[in-house]
Amino acid sequence: MPAKTATAVKRTTTTKKSAAKRKTSKAVKKAGKRTQSKAKGAQKVKKAATRRTPSKSAGARKATKKAGARKASTKRSATKKTTAAPAAAAAPATDAPAAAATPSKATGSAKKASARKSSAKKPAKGGKKKSAKKN
């Protein structure tokens, strides 16, 4: 029994880190955290950028394409959902008269859509005017 207590008492000593070492390790940890937060921020910025004008990098282009596809799919589902205006969906060329024939709610949404389209055609600051896309 006494032998056991003796082994329990014995402690392994650890060498104390010098102040400089402690500081550097702390700095390294902080730097790591900083880069992580920076990366997160960059992602957010990129997302915001894809919402705004498309950037010219391949990755950004892909992102905008995907965003466009997402938007298109939601638009498609929206047209499927509205049972009142199948004619408007069938004939996009005659958009305004079809909207006039449908109830007021549909006309409101159509107006919004047309406004969105016109705003899409407007050039970004210092950019060229975008050609009107069919879809």
Swiss-Prot record:
Q: Where is the composition biased (Low complexity)?
A: 1-17, 80-112
Region described as Disordered:
1-135
One Gene Ontology term of the molecular function aspect: DNA binding
Q: Which domain of life is it from?
A: Eukaryota
Q: Which Gene Ontology cellular component terms are annotated?
A: chromosome; nucleus
UniProt entry keywords in alphabetical sequence: Chromosome, DNA-binding, Nucleus
Q: Where in the cell is it found?
A: Nucleus; Chromosome
Composition bias, Basic residues: 18-54, 62-79, 113-135
Describe its function: Histones H1 are necessary for the condensation of nucleosome chains into higher-order structures.
| Name of the molecule in the record | Histone H1, macronuclear
Q: Which organism is it from?
A: Euplotes eurystomus (Ciliate)
Lineage, opening ranks: Eukaryota, Sar, Alveolata, Ciliophora, Intramacronucleata
